């Protein structure tokens, strides 16, 4: 397993110099953030990003994300041009040596929370999702803006988008995802670029918008849309783990044995009610997920791909992008790597004893 770290480019207060100093972190997960959604990424800009990262002794391990244009999700006639642009981006990424692309198929909004700075008992602040508060929000009023959201929409555009999604069912969205997968995965396969779809976060409908990448059954359906190791998953423990019916270690073993786990997000969450949760430190005792069992499942399948510590709390007076500070994520990376080292050495010890 390669430990990686999310970096939001030159505007990120967490610099590459800082990331390079985290023990065990060797890769960067990033993207190009100044290209409008739907346009092809120029090869030159990809190389510029890659070289900047490599100049700091790190590798560009994953692109997260290449956003999927809403016309594709809506199934509009214009989707074919946007899909061609997407395929061009994949070809340019492959030419630059990038081999994994993370993406999602969530309508309009990316990951969603009700508050970005919920005060925890220890004095740190964290992201929180309270279903009742989200139900009372009107996203058209701009009450909340999150790091993963496309904020380029004007009020009229956002309202129009919601109207277009008004009558979309989950099956409609599945049909549009299938169209996208069957067009894009062959191109990715040809370029040897592994695609990794991120689960919906949270994994249930919000603001009346359908969400479909939510559980084992739907992940299984996704991988069968086009059967290829290049049509894989970004297995996010936090996104899926807020549903108590999602057994994360079991999902890792099940899809890992099929060769479908292409990328992993590791974080803990604390379930505080029905469809409500708060982010916690990565430590098992601080949340609802057993991070040891999750890492053990990855060790059991001999996972050799990239993983990253996901959202962290804001601690020690740090300010910056909510969920993406340096300190708590760095603690998470070292904690996760420590478990990985222990499990790896134990596995070798058992193998040696069995061979005596």
UniProtKB/Swiss-Prot annotation:
Gene3D superfamilies assigned: Divalent-metal-dependent TIM barrel enzymes
Domain of life: Bacteria
Alphabetized UniProt keyword annotations: Iron, Lyase, Manganese
GO biological process: D-glucuronate catabolic process
InterPro entries for the chain: Man_deHydtase (IPR004628), Xyl_isomerase-like_sf (IPR036237)
Enzyme kind, highest EC tier: lyase
Reactions catalysed, as given in the entry: D-mannonate = 2-dehydro-3-deoxy-D-gluconate + H2O
Disulfide bonds: none
Pathway: Carbohydrate metabolism; pentose and glucuronate interconversion
EC id: 4.2.1.8
Cofactor(s) this protein requires: Fe(2+); Mn(2+)
GO molecular function annotations of the record: ferrous iron binding; manganese ion binding; mannonate dehydratase activity
Family assignment from sequence similarity: Belongs to the mannonate dehydratase family.
HAMAP family membership: UxuA (MF_00106)
NCBIfam families reported for this sequence: PRK03906.1, uxuA
Functional note: Catalyzes the dehydration of D-mannonate.
Listed name of the protein: Mannonate dehydratase 2
Protein source organism: Bacillus licheniformis (strain ATCC 14580 / DSM 13 / JCM 2505 / CCUG 7422 / NBRC 12200 / NCIMB 9375 / NCTC 10341 / NRRL NRS-1264 / Gibson 46)
């Amino acid at each position: 397993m390669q430990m990686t770290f999310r970096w939001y480019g030159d505007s990120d207060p967490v610099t590459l110099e800082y990331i390079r100093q985290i023990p065990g972190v060797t890769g960067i997960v990033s993207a190009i953030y100044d290209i409008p959604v739907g346009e092809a990424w120029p090869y030159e800009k990809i190389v510029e990003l890659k070289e900047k990262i490599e100049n700091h002794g790190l590798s560009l391990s994953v692109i997260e994300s290449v956003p999927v244009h809403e016309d594709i999700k809506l199934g509009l006639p214009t989707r074919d041009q946007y899909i061609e642009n997407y395929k061009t981006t994949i070809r340019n990424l492959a030419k630059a040596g990038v081999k994994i692309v993370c993406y999602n198929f969530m309508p309009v909004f990316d990951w969603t929370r009700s508050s970005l700075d919920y005060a925890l008992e220890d004095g740190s602040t964290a992201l929180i999702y309270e279903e009742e508060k989200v139900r009372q929000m009107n996203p058209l009023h701009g009450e909340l803006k999150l790091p993963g959201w496309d904020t380029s929409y004007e009020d009229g555009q956002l309202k129009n988008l919601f109207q277009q999604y008004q009558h979309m069912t989950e099956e409609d969205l599945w049909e549009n995802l299938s169209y996208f997968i069957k067009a894009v995965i062959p191109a990715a396969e040809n370029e040897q670029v592994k695609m990794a779809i991120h689960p919906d976060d949270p994994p249930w409908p919000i603001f009346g918008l359908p969400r479909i990448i939510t559980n084992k059954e739907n992940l299984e359906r996704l991988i069968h849309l086009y059967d290829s190791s290049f049509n894989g998953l970004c297995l996010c423990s936090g996104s899926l783990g807020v549903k108590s019916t999602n057994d994360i270690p079991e999902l890792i073993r099940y899809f890992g044995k099929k060769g479908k786990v292409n990328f992993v997000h590791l974080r803990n969450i604390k379930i505080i009610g029905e469809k409500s949760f708060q982010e916690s430190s990565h430590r098992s005792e601080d949340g609802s997920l057993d991070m040891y069992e999750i890492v053990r499942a990855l060790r059991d399948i001999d996972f050799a791909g990239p993983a990253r510590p996901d959202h962290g709390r804001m601690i020690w007076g740090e300010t910056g992008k909510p969920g993406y500070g340096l300190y708590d994520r760095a603690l998470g990376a070292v904690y996760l790597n420590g478990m990985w080292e222990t499990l790896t050495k134990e596995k070798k010890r058992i193998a040696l004893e069995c061979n005596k």
